[in-house]
Swiss-Prot record:
Top enzyme class: hydrolase
Function: Hydrolyzes intracellular trehalose to glucose. The disaccharide trehalose serves as a storage molecule for energy and carbohydrates that is mobilized during nutrient stress.
Binding residue positions for Ca(2+): 117, 119, 121, 123, 128
Active site: 481 (proton donor/acceptor), 676 (proton donor/acceptor)
Segments for region (Disordered): 1-47, 54-73
Similarity comment: Belongs to the glycosyl hydrolase 37 family.
Taxonomic placement: Eukaryota, Fungi, Dikarya, Ascomycota, Saccharomycotina
Subcellular location per the Swiss-Prot or TrEMBL entry: Cytoplasm
Coiled coil: none
Protein name from the UniProt record: Cytosolic neutral trehalase
Signal peptide coordinates: none
UniProt cross-references to InterPro entries, sorted A to Z: 6-hairpin_glycosidase_sf, 6hp_glycosidase-like_sf, Glyco_hydro_37, Glyco_hydro_37_CS, Trehalase_Ca-bd
Tagged with keyword Calcium: yes
Length: 754
């Protein structure tokens, strides 16, 4: 990282101020920073030169007894970086508090890209070979005098800010140097909390229903129009949606009821006319008309290209949203999950019609508890009511989905990812299964598209292909699509991840029944009403997991194949989900820390599995995104929390530093990038992932405005384990090896390095 930054408090001295300086915080959100109050073109002086008003330098503090600060609100202290100085030798330049006057945004943007974006991808990164310097005007001189902005980080931030200014239709802007050389830890945290979550938030309302309902994944004639399906007994929601469709017929929005009984056959019948599934809505009074109207609760989506509510992504995003005080969005997602279970029978993979048979890893009990606590817990009747409804729904899903056929294996008493479904998953990209279908097409002497139609219409029967797609749907339900761990076997595996989550459900339900509902949850079947009932279920599950999944010698929980009745040997990071659930004994936790953790810890954090388990790669056996060498935010978050639960916060601190370094380094070197997953074995370009589906969050022009949902959360949550010393190190991109190596002996212990 290079450039120049203020790393010292300003000296006391007299200064002039301006109305702009007093109003606009250098770290405010783009809608404020590039709003009308800061537009130079609207603040022209009436002097004889008709020149833009001259503003004084904005300093974070000045004068004896004067207190003023633009410190980011997300940190109690600001720890800026030291960077190389430029030619400007003024006092303000030496303090890193210059302000730049960009007289022509479009012209400057073009010049910047022409000079610095040498690979033409509309980003400025360490891979570009430009001069890494640009001249810009100063505010004090109305742009007459120029200074230099240097280095990849500041230039990429300049590109981001100019791109945002253009989005707000700004022709001229005044930019604070503090915004361009902001400590990257502060900047990323600020963007996640103040901008990314906003960009990822959706809700079903009259303004965007057609956009959200439109499906980009399905390319059939009947999929051209936006469509939404509504549960048969949701008349208010149905009428509201019909009203919106009639308000603007040009949208061609179709609103249809679903039947009471939803079968796999019915779900398949919707594949050529897919639609969005209605979510929870609440009644509001229209302030203009005074009439009652229904509006959807807000929810967050994983990435910018998504409009659906996703299953387990939502839990991890909720953790970050709560950390950012976005309680309304986190609560909205709990409301949606309650609605989905009540009306669709389960928390869905996502709220599209072709996901009606498929769930995802269950996290509702912990999610509801986190939201309830943020709402005030038992001191808030609204929070307790939400908790009651959420746990009632979670228990329903537990009994009818996760511990029922076909997901429950009766012999072991453990559960598998075994969803219903018929035919080929329609949401996959064209050609995704061609290598599998080719031999069947040749068998029937037809083309692959023709065979696909024959198979989906059940005019031909291929039992082996049925089993293949059963496992494929299971992989998608597991959330780990795809991995060699699950290939051609997923539906037959009692996995440590799913059964850890169900154990967590059991202990959470026991806790809530006892604490909030007088140890008697009315309306439940016999054997499931009291805390003692659920504690017994948890004890039995732990015994079965220890019997079938735990391996004392290696210190791993492995998956168990219920068909072959054999334990697998695939070393997955999900072994640590048992710690997150609180299911392991202290002795088991120690074995995992001593034996499993060293195998899964890499340069940038925890890897999804070991290289040995993944096996050799080839043209016929390509990389899978949920395997080595990739690391994922949900794994980091659960393992951090699980280790802390068992007294290993030192290891959590070390692992979190590794992951946060990787994220920060990519953010600094690659134009503010925040992506879905990282290669945790690479220190230079960890965002570059060569696997199926690419890497969500990497494809942007000029500025990243969303990041990726659960990765955003991981940064906020990981920072909670960092002290000021670690934050400073991350802000200057000190590698884990150097950082750990320079720690004093007492500090090394805090990172599990003694």
């Amino acid at each position: 990282m290079d450039g120049k930054v203020n790393n010292n408090p300003p000296r006391s001295r007299h200064r002039r101020t301006s109305s702009l300086e007093e109003v606009v915080d250098p770290f405010s959100t783009p809608d404020v920073y590039y709003g009308p109050k800061s537009d130079p073109s609207k603040l022209l002086s009436k002097n004889r030169f008709t020149r833009t008003r001259t503003f004084s330098v904005a300093e974070p503090g000045g004068g004896k007894g004067h207190s003023s600060s633009y410190t980011s609100p997300y940190f109690d202290t600001t720890v800026p970086l030291r960077r190389r100085g430029s030619e400007d030798d003024s006092y303000s330049a030496s303090q890193g508090q210059r302000r730049f006057y960009i007289e022509d945004v479009d012209k400057t943007l073009k010049e910047l890209l022409a000079s610095e974006d040498t690979d033409g991808n509309y980003q400025i990164t360490i891979e570009d070979t430009g001069p890494k310097v640009i001249r810009v005007g100063t505010v004090n001189s109305n742009g007459y005098k120029h200074v230099h902005i240097r280095g990849t980080y500041m230039l990429s931030n300049l590109l981001q800010e100019l791109t945002l200014a253009k989005l707000f239709n700004r022709k001229q802007v005044i930019l604070d140097e503090a915004r361009l050389n902001e400590n990257p830890v502060n900047r990323m945290t600020r963007l996640i909390s103040g901008q990314f979550w906003k960009s990822l938030t959706r809700r079903i309302d009259s303004n965007n229903i057609a956009k959200i309902a439109y499906d980009t994944k399905i390319d059939t004639p009947k999929a051209k129009n936006p469509r939404i399906y509504v549960p048969y007994n949701c008349q208010d929601e149905y009428q509201q949606l019909v009203q919106w469709s009639e308000m603007d017929p040009s949208l061609q929005l179709e609103v249809n009821y679903l039947p009471k009984d939803i079968t796999p056959e019915f779900v398949k019948s919707l594949n050529d006319k897919p639609g969005l599934l209605c979510l929870a809505m609440e009644s509001h009074m229209d302030p203009v008309t005074g009439e009652e109207t229904w509006v959807g609760f807000p929810y967050a989506v994983p990435g910018g290209r998504f409009n659906e509510l996703y299953g387990w992504d939502s839990y991890f995003m909720a953790l970050g949203l709560l950390e950012s005080n976005k309680l309304d969005v986190a609560r909205g997602m709990v409301e949606h999950f309650i609605f989905e279970i009540d009306h669709y029978g389960k928390i869905l993979n996502a709220n599209r019609s072709y996901y009606l048979c498929r769930s995802q890893p269950p996290f509702l009990t912990d999610m509801a508890l986190q939201v309830c606590r943020k709402m005030g817990g038992d001191k808030n009747p609204v929070a307790v009511d939400l908790l009651r409804r959420a746990f009632k729904a979670a228990i329903k899903e537990y009994l009818t989905v996760w511990t029922a056929s076909p997901r429950l294996d009766e012999k072991t008493g453990l559960s598998c990812y075994h969803p219903d479904g018929i035919g080929i998953p329609p949401e996959t990209e064209p050609g995704h299964f061609d290598s599998i279908l080719r031999k069947y097409a040749e068998k029937y002497n037809v083309s692959i598209p023709e065979f696909r139609d024959l198979y989906n219409s059940q005019k031909v029967h291929e039992p082996d292909l049925d089993v293949f797609f059963l496992h494929d749907r299971g992989v998608r339900e597991s959330g780990h699509d795809t991995t060699y761990r699950f290939e051609n076997v997923c539906a037959y595996l009692a996995t440590i991840d799913l059964n850890s989550l169900l154990y967590k459900y059991e202990v959470d339900i026991a806790y809530v029944i006892k604490k909030y509902f007088g140890d008697n949850f009315e309306g439940l079947p016999e054997g499931h009403r009291t805390s003692n009932d659920w504690e017994k279920l948890a004890e039995v599950r732990k015994e079965r997991i220890d019997k079938y999944l735990w391996d004392e010698e290696t210190g791993f929980y492995y998956d168990y194949n219920v068909k072959t009745e054999k334990r697998t040997s695939y070393e997955s990071v999900t072994t640590f989900w048992a710690l997150w659930a609180g299911m392991s004994s202290q002795e088991q936790a120690q074995r995992m820390v001593e034996n499993a953790l060293p195998k899964l810890e890499e340069f940038g954090g925890l890897v999804a599995c070991t290289a040995r388990s993944r096996g050799e790669l080839s043209l016929d056996r390509p990389t899978r995104q949920w395997d080595y060498p990739f690391g994922w935010a949900p794994h980091q978050i659960l393992v951090w929390d699980g280790l802390v639960r068992y007294g290993y916060e030192n290891h959590t601190r070390r692992l979190a530093y590794r992951w946060l370094f990787l994220m920060t380094k990519a953010f600094v070197d690659y134009n503010g990038i925040v992506v879905e997953k990282y290669d945790v074995t690479r220190g230079t370009d960890p965002h570059r992932v060569d696997a199926e589906y690419g890497n969500q969050g990497a494809d942007f022009k000029g500025v990243a405005t969303e990041g990726f949902g659960w990765v955003n959360s991981s940064y906020l949550l990981g920072m909670k384990y960092m002290n000021n010393f670690a934050r400073r190190a991350l802000g200057t991109c000190v590698t884990p090896k150097v950082f750990f190596g320079r720690l004093p002996p007492k500090e090394k212990k805090k990172y599990g390095l003694e």
